[in-house]
Amino acid sequence: MSKNLLIELGLEELPAYVVTPSEKQLGERLATFLTENRLSFEDIQTFSTPRRLAVRVSGLADQQTDLTEDFKGPAKKIALDADGNFSKAAQGFVRGKGLTTDAIEFREVKGEEYVYVTKHEAGKPAKEVLLGVTEVLSAMTFPVSMHWANNSFEYIRPVHTLTVLLNDEALELDFLDIHSGRVSRGHRFLGTETTITSADSYEADLRSQCVIVDAKERQEMIVEQIKTLEVEQGVQVDIDEDLLNEVLNLVEFPTAFMGNFEAKYLDVPEEVLVTSMKNHQRYFVVRDQAGHLMPNFVSVRNGNDQAIENVIKGNEKVLVARLEDGEFFWREDQKLQIADLVAKLTNVTFHEKIGSLAEHMDRTRVIAASLAKEANLSAEEVTAVDRAAQIYKFDLLTGMVGEFDELQGIMGEKYALLAGEDAAVATAIREHYLPDAAGGALPETKVGAVLALADKLDTLLSFFSVGLIPSGSNDPYALRRATQGIVRILDHFGWRIPMDKLVDSLYDLSFDSLTYTNKADVMNFIRARVDKMMGKAAPKDIREAILASSTFVVPEMLAVAEALVKASHTENYKPAVESLSRAFNLAEKADASVQVDPSLFENEQENTLFAAIQGLTLAGSAAQQLEQVFALSPVINDFFDNTMVMAEDQALKNNRVAILSDLVSKAKTIAAFNQLNTK
């Protein structure tokens, strides 16, 4: 008869960002443990709050399934001695399996007999197997861990309780310094220690102690309560998904409420108010029906609505202190001069091994000028890029950004506009940080995009030049994100800037502040980001073929990846790739100094292929170019069927290989077709 298993780990308050992944990890690790230990089950449900991680297994088998395994041993000629007795090798083999030589039988494998034994292991009761379940808890990994009391071990937070129930029976286990039982803890203020009656009563037992253990239910409660406030107050609440996920992991019993602040603070830029509420206080922003910011906020209390008025007043008081700071910095920063702030950037360190922010900006300005030409910007846009590059970090020295660093760039745009800077310049100051996350928003203007590229390129080259290169998962300076941003921006704007030539030109630049080095590593790093971008849809062989092409133009490479993926599902893909691959492989033997001499042609097929190559313009989209190359497949095959490429006559051989080399030089601008897999 199956049973239900409950495991709850009671801890000190967990960081909100750890709760959900830890809940998931616990469920996955327990499922693996049960599977590896041959305990079947029907379902696993996980639970979490800031003070507990729990999992319930439904339909758990009473005992392990029996195990029957065959083991292959030494060959018969080794297993038997000259007298036909079992050798030490055979005896040692069966002894290692916990058996005797009576269990030995011989089986033929590929014409030779080998020792085989069959071992039968009866399944153990589930209760006995579950005594080892603490290894699941011990194996849990966390971003940070800590010691407590005089213990030598580490965990995410101090552990207070461990509840392990098989139906209504408490299993006795030891984990760290805790002995398991059926005692759990209710809400920190509204509950007490409580007894969990059974695995099935878990949610109800803790609900009576003002703890909602199901994270999804807490989320639904929060959303429903906010929706009720919206209707009652006639407003709209920005239910930011990331904030919602954070807040639900800060509370065990959620109660949403609305607070207010003075309307005078609405004169401060909206971004300042939103940052104060959302990022610093974990409040939800309130708007009117037209979408305008209201002097209100919604917060979620960890508790019921008892004395909620006092809670509201306390939250309002804390927020007003933040808003006062914002209002003060907004007023005082407007008295500052951009030129003065830029001058002070010479004293701000970009990185101790690289130099100052001012030096970083100087290099960025030079790179931006080069990129502006490559991107065919207008004269007005070139001027805007240059001006933006001169000042774009000035807001880092304002009081507002010093207090609210999330507003860097955003406040730069606003202060630049107030100072009379061109709108394109101001926008570029904000956009140069984009994208600021994987999949984040990209710059919308060409000026902002060029500045973003230049800033990221100098950052990448500078850190690589001083040996600060990401390794493994370690990337403290977010160089992978910056490089991914470079790739995404180039693709978004369709700028066909050859990255290899661009990087070469940057390494030719001379700066007093820094000399760029490690070019090969930089190029490989950029290739890896392009590979990752293609990897969303393209298999490995297609990615490798494109990365081995003679073209390093990001938009074209990504377009070719898409075209090849689509083409790989067509009938002519395999024969076309195979004929091109043959040409590629033979072209590797080409003498680069040999030019095709039509007077040496001995058959019509040579003439036809050469003419087709000469007429190959590779115009249009990536799909159209691929179609043009694939269309040569019959001509290539006809050439191979009627021509001995590796002729004994050296002149003929060189000439024919040169024909193929001409083909490859054009086709390789798309991909190295011999890297593609047609099996």
From Swiss-Prot:
Keywords tagged on the record: Aminoacyl-tRNA synthetase, ATP-binding, Cytoplasm, Ligase, Nucleotide-binding, Protein biosynthesis
Chief localization: cytoplasm
Give the EC number(s) listed in the UniProt record.
6.1.1.14
Subunit: Tetramer of two alpha and two beta subunits.
Q: Which family does it belong to?
A: Belongs to the class-II aminoacyl-tRNA synthetase family.
- At the top level, the lineage of the source is Bacteria
An annotated GO BP: glycyl-tRNA aminoacylation
Cite a GO CC annotation: cytosol
- Write down a Pfam family by its short name: tRNA_synt_2f
**Catalyses which reaction(s):** tRNA(Gly) + glycine + ATP = glycyl-tRNA(Gly) + AMP + diphosphate
Location of the protein in the cell: Cytoplasm
Q: What is this protein called?
A: Glycine--tRNA ligase beta subunit
Q: Which GO terms describe its molecular function?
A: ATP binding; glycine-tRNA ligase activity
